């Protein structure tokens, strides 16, 4: 849930991890985390929406000045791990936020011949 909330959001918004603590990025990160928690529950993992969102906030606070690995990939114009994170959530359940984040990053990758 943490990676789904932080990585794609920071990569697309071009912000450090702490940027997901403020709106509107916090809304996107929290929604992606909630969808991921739902996918986890459907797979038998006990993860509440509240716990997933709290984990995103805790990691974002602890790593506020850090650049996520996905944002680092974007900066270096490398293919990202979006398929394994947000894409995986969107494949398992109806997850419009994760699907949108994955779609936007995949479009960015295609435009650079990375996929």
PLM segments and residue spans:
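NAD(P)-dependent Rossmann-like dehydrogenase/reductase catalytic/cofactor-binding core
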Residues: 30, 34-115
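Active-site-proximal catalytic alpha-helix in oxidoreductases
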Residues: 1-38, 64-65
